[in-house]
Amino acid sequence: MSWSILEFLRKNPEELKNNLKRRAIDVSLVDKAVELDKKWRQVLQEVERLRHQHNVLSSQIPKLSGEERKKKIEESKNLLKILEDKEKELEKIEVERDRLLSTLPNLVADDVPNGPDDSYNIPIKFWGKFKVYEGDVEEFLRQTKDANVNYEIIKWKPKGHAEMLEDVLHLGNTLKAAEIAGSRFYYLFNDIVWLDFALLLFAIDYITQQGYTLVLPPYMLRGEVIQSVIDLDTFKDAIYKIENEDLYLIATAEHSIAAMFFKEEIEKDKLPLKFAGISPAFRKEAGAANKDLKGIFRVHQFHKVEQFIFSTPEDSWKYHAELITNAESIFQQLELPYRIVNIASGDLGACAAKKFDLEVWMPAQAKFREMVSCSNCTDWQAFRMKIRYVDRKNNKRGYVHTLNSTAIASTRTITAILENYQREDGVVEVPKVLRKYLEIFPKAPKDYIYPLKNKII
C-alpha cells in the first residue's frame, strides 16, 4: 500500500488541492508534484523496458559464439550503461518528488472544522464543575454557550498561578532564573517540586495500567530523524539545536518514540504498539514572544508524560479515541474541569490529520487553557521515517499510522491546580488522586500546600 498523499496525487489531485485549501496553503505545490510524478512514471517505464531488454540479451549470450557473441556482449555493455544512467535519472526525480511531497501537510480528516486559525476551533464536550468568579460569569457563559455546563459562582477573585507561585506560596522564582538563564525559565521549590513528580508518577502509573510500555527515550535526535518526525522547516525556530553537533533537543517524548522504528518494518500482528514516554521537553517558544510572560505556563523546559501508538491504518481512529479518553480520565481523576476542542484545519499543524485539545478552565484568567494535545498523524510521519508494517499472510506492506497525546505536562498542570485548588487564604489543596504518591515521602505535602512566611530566594 502506498502513501496516502501519493495515492491522492495520482488518483484525485483536485481533492489534494482542496485539502491544502482547507489549511490555507498554496495549491500550486500539487501541480508541481503531479508533473514530477508523471515524469517519474514515464522514466520508470523506460527503466523497466531497458531492464527487460538487457535480461533478454544476457540470456542469449551463453548460447552464442565467435563474433556474434562478442557483438552481443558489447551491445549488452552499452545497454547496461544506458540503463544505469536512466536509473540515476529515475532516482533523482524520485528524490525531488518525495522532497516536494514531504513539504505537504497531512490530509485533513473530513470531520475537522474548516477555518484558518484557532478562532474556528469547536468545543465538543465539557466536563466537571467550573468555579467562576462573580465578575466573570458573563464571559464564562460566552465561552460555554449552549453547553448547559455545571458551575458555581465564587465571590472572591482567585489569584493567577504566577502570583500564587511567587507572591503567595513563595515556592517559585522566575526573576532569578531569568537573570541566569533568560526568560521562561524558573526555580521551583519544595512542595511544588513534589507536586511536579507526583503528577508524573500518577500519569505513568495510570497509563501503564492501560497496557502501555513505559519508556525513557533519548533526549536528543539527529537532524535526519527530527526532520522526519516534524516539519523542521516550520518548527526550526521552536526547537533547540546543539551548536556544532547534528543533534536537536526533543520538544516531547513523541519525537524519540516515533523514531523508535526508523527505517524498519513491523510485523502487522504485533500492532498496535503502545508506549508511555517520560522525558523533559525543551522548547524555544519563539512564536510566543508576548504570550504568558509571567509564571510557568509557557516555558522553555518542563517534564512531560506522552502517550504514543503505532497502529494499522484501519484501527488508527479507534486508538485516537482511546488516547483522548485516557487523557480525560487523568484530568477527571485530578478533578480539573475542562473542555475538549476539535481543532480547525488551519490550526492543526502539518503532522496531524485531526487533533483534539483538552483545555482546563482557569478561574483566575477566566479562560480555558490547553493542557493536552491529541493527534492522529495517520501515515505522515511513517512515510517520512520509512516505517512500514508487513502482513506476511496476505503478502502486503504498508505504512503504519502514528498517534500521540499528552498524558501530563507537569508545569501546565501545576498552573491549573494552583488556580482551581486555591482557597481564599492562599492555601492550595492537593488533588486527592496525587496523595498516595506523596505519602511515602516524609517531607512531601500530604493534603495541603501552605504559603511560606518568607521567600527561599
From Swiss-Prot:
E.C. no: 6.1.1.11
Catalytic activity: tRNA(Ser) + L-serine + ATP = L-seryl-tRNA(Ser) + AMP + diphosphate + H(+); tRNA(Sec) + L-serine + ATP = L-seryl-tRNA(Sec) + AMP + diphosphate + H(+)
Keywords from the named record: Aminoacyl-tRNA synthetase, ATP-binding, Cytoplasm, Ligase, Nucleotide-binding, Protein biosynthesis
CDD domains, per database record: SerRS_core
Quaternary structure (record): Homodimer. The tRNA molecule binds across the dimer.
HAMAP family membership: Ser_tRNA_synth_type1 (MF_00176)
Protein name per the record: Serine--tRNA ligase
Source organism: Saccharolobus islandicus (strain Y.G.57.14 / Yellowstone #1)
